[in-house]
Regions:
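Acyl-donor (CoA/ACP) binding surface of acyl/acetyltransferases
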Residues: 1-65, 96, 100-201
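Generic surface-pattern signal
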Residues: 14-15, 83, 87
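Hydrophobic recognition helices of helix-based DNA-binding modules
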Residues: 85, 89, 150-153
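Conserved GNAT-fold acetyl-CoA-binding loop/helix
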Residues: 62-84, 95-97
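Short loop/turn motifs at secondary-structure junctions and domain boundaries
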Residues: 88-92, 179
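Hydrophobic alpha-helical elements and their junctions with loops/disorder across both membrane
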Residues: 70-71, 85, 157, 168
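A generic membrane alpha-helix/interface feature
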Residues: 77-80, 92, 173, 196
Length: 201
């Protein structure tokens, strides 16, 4: 897979984003992402040994339906994704946590920073989750933890999130976490052969 694919995966559609390598405080944080713990979850950096767990949900077309990447057809695609994430860690770039279900130590999804604007101290959070764990409040739990980290550790001023308007469940997660719906961007993203509207928070 090309770097262009993974840039699209991260949602790099903004005019001002993180440079290839972030220096200083932000780079240090992203190079050594702090583990976040919630009642049911551990949010930790991903590892190559997570490959089978990640492939298990990334191969699901329903999981991929409303995100910017296509369902993985082979485990090699998942390995390429993880190598990309590990490179982001090494470079101190905004990246993703693995969402670990404490009960089984299984990686069931990812959540993290799509980009970070150091001048305006703003970021966007994106996520994906195994279908086996939908409708259980898990993503709300994870998103609350990452929002706290964004404000308390990264000292950011603004945290954004956006989703396909055809996926209202994701909007409900944002609202439960105290985010405010700011509007709808028409034809904002070209994804899977069509332009889609997105709600922004």
């Amino acid at each position: 897979m090309s770097d262009a694919f993974f840039q699209r995966l991260r949602g790099e559609l903004h005019l001002k984003e993180a440079p290839a390598t972030m220096d200083g405080y932000y780079g240090d944080v992203f190079s050594h992402l702090p583990v976040l713990e919630t009642p049911r979850l551990l949010l930790r950096p991903l590892k190559m040994s997570d490959c089978q767990d990640v492939f298990a949900y990334c191969r699901d077309p329903e999981v991929a339906r409303h995100v910017l990447w296509d369902a993985h057809q082979t485990i090699g695609q998942t390995r390429a994704f993880l190598r990309y994430i590990l490179r982001q860690y090494r470079n101190g770039e905004p990246s993703s946590y693995g969402i670990v279900w404490k009960e089984t130590h299984q990686v069931i999804g990812t959540i993290g920073f799509m980009w970070l604007n150091t001048e305006n101290r703003s970021t966007e959070i994106g996520y994906s989750l195994s279908r086996d764990f939908w409708n259980r409040g898990i993503m709300t739990e994870a998103l609350q933890a990452v929002i706290r980290m964004a404000f308390d550790t990264l000292k950011l001023h603004r945290v954004e999130a956006q989703h396909d308007t055809a996926n209202p469940a994701s909007g409900r997660v944002r609202l439960k976490c105290g985010m405010l719906h700011e509007g709808t961007l028409r034809g904002r993203i070209y994804n899977k052969g069509q332009y889609i509207d997105v709600d922004i928070y």
